[in-house]
UniProtKB/Swiss-Prot annotation:
Membrane-related topology note: Peripheral membrane protein
Pathway(s) of this molecule: Cofactor biosynthesis; ubiquinone biosynthesis
Signal sequence region: none
Gene label: COQ4
Short name of any one Pfam family annotated for the protein: Coq4
Protein name: Ubiquinone biosynthesis protein COQ4, mitochondrial
Quaternary context: Component of a multi-subunit COQ enzyme complex, composed of at least COQ3, COQ4, COQ5, COQ6, COQ7 and COQ9.
Species this chain originates from: Paracoccidioides brasiliensis (strain Pb18)
Keyword Endoplasmic reticulum: no
Cofactors: Zn(2+)
Reactions catalysed according to its record: a 4-hydroxy-3-methoxy-5-(all-trans-polyprenyl)benzoate + H(+) = a 2-methoxy-6-(all-trans-polyprenyl)phenol + CO2
Transit peptide start-stop: 1-11
Role: Lyase that catalyzes the C1-decarboxylation of 4-hydroxy-3-methoxy-5-(all-trans-polyprenyl)benzoic acid into 2-methoxy-6-(all-trans-polyprenyl)phenol during ubiquinone biosynthesis.
Similarity annotation: Belongs to the COQ4 family.
Length: 285
């Protein structure tokens, strides 16, 4: 047998041996009565029917109540496979910083990020901007759900990383956690990551007030599409190494355009509404 043929056979054999466990799991039929063992701590293998039911149920539930973070997390996991989470993982593998993140497996939590250290950073630094945003919104870095329904262990980490970095995206864009702000940020994330859950979250526009919907269509949707497509893939940002950098410098480096301050817009609209009501009452009296 020619050497090139032997080498080709060895290569194919290696590829077969090193197929990810998720491929083996997804290609092997099972039922709720003979569920395979988990691929990582906390992993729950799902049948195709179970995954579909989880996607539909969590989509309906999160649309009815956009504040249910657990349902949004389940929707993200149920719809990320078989293609989208692998595309995001491959985007990390094709980037030097993304590869380091996959190798190091950093986690973002109150145990890994010192709030006191973040508050000691210069006012316009990434870390200070992040902790100021956490304080203003009344949230913390430990509020993210743990990934359970993605079969491949490495892809599960990619989803966990995306989830734990979400508040950094909030901080650098300045968008608050009100539904209007979340929909705007999810639209940006969809343009940047292509994760289906981020796109499906746009249906929450239907739950916005008329003036909020108008702002979304005229202001936030164009910004999100423009900035999300033009910027570098945010999954490849090693946030732990960017904490001391000037936040404006980081935005410029990533190509992220900061949207108008939504909190200030909402405050201004409330003031105008109160002034109009007071003027109307004065006129009627």
């Amino acid at each position: 047998m020619p050497p090139t043929v032997r080498q080709g056979i060895r290569t194919v054999g290696t590829l077969r041996v090193t197929r990810p466990s998720s491929y083996v799991l997804s290609s092997r039929e099972f039922s709720v009565l003979n569920r395979p063992p988990p691929n990582y701590p906390g992993h729950i293998p799902l049948t195709t029917i179970e995954r579909g039911a989880l996607a539909v149920g969590s989509a309906i539930g999160s649309l009815l109540n956009p504040r249910r973070a657990d349902l949004i997390a389940a929707l993200g996991e149920a719809t990320a496979t078989p293609y989208f989470i692998y595309r995001l993982r491959d985007a990390m593998l094709s980037n030097p910083t993304g590869r380091r993140i996959l190798r190091d497996r950093p986690r973002i939590s109150s145990k890994t990020l010192s709030v006191e250290y973040l508050r000691s950073l210069p006012p316009n630094s990434v870390g200070r901007t992040y902790v100021n945003w956490l304080d203003r919104e009344g949230v913390g870095p430990d509020s993210r759900e743990t990934v359970r329904y993605i079969d491949d262990e490495e892809c599960a980490y990619v989803m966990q990383r995306y989830r734990e970095c979400h508040d950094f995206y909030h901080a650098v864009t300045g968008l608050p956690i009100v539904v209007e702000g979340e929909v705007a940020l999810k639209t940006f994330e969809f343009a940047n990551t292509l994760l289906p859950m981020t796109g499906l979250s746009m249906f929450a526009v239907m739950r916005l007030k008329p003036e909020e919907r108008e702002r979304y269509w005229e202001l936030h949707l164009p910004w999100a599409v423009r900035s999300g497509l033009a910027s570098k893939e945010v999954i490849n940002v090693y946030w732990e190494e960017e904490l001391e950098r000037d936040v404006n410098e980081l935005r410029e480096k990533l190509g992220i355009e900061k949207p108008p301050d939504l909190r200030e817009i909402r405050k201004m609209m409330r003031r105008q509404k109160k002034a109009a009501e007071a003027a109307r009452e004065k006129y009627q009296n």
